[in-house]
Amino acid sequence: MEKYCELVRKRYAEIASGDLGYVPDALGCVLKVLNEVAADSALSESVREKAAYAAANLLVSDYVNE
């Protein structure tokens, strides 16, 4: 957990304690958020590219592993 930022660690603790809801479809949740970030024209192009690249890699790995 140390390699993740403070906000990620905080949300992890909240989910683990039951204070924040757990999403069973974690991959779907991640892809939805990455897609939203990639599509948000208010964000910098570099952030949008990182999100798009991460989403595309998840989609490829999910497809290849089936």
From Swiss-Prot:
Sequence intervals crossing the membrane: none
Signal peptide start and end residues: none
NCBIfam families assigned: PRK04964.1
HAMAP family membership: UPF0253
Entry similarity comment: Belongs to the UPF0253 family.
Protein's name in the database: UPF0253 protein YaeP
Organism of derivation: Salmonella typhimurium (strain LT2 / SGSC1412 / ATCC 700720)
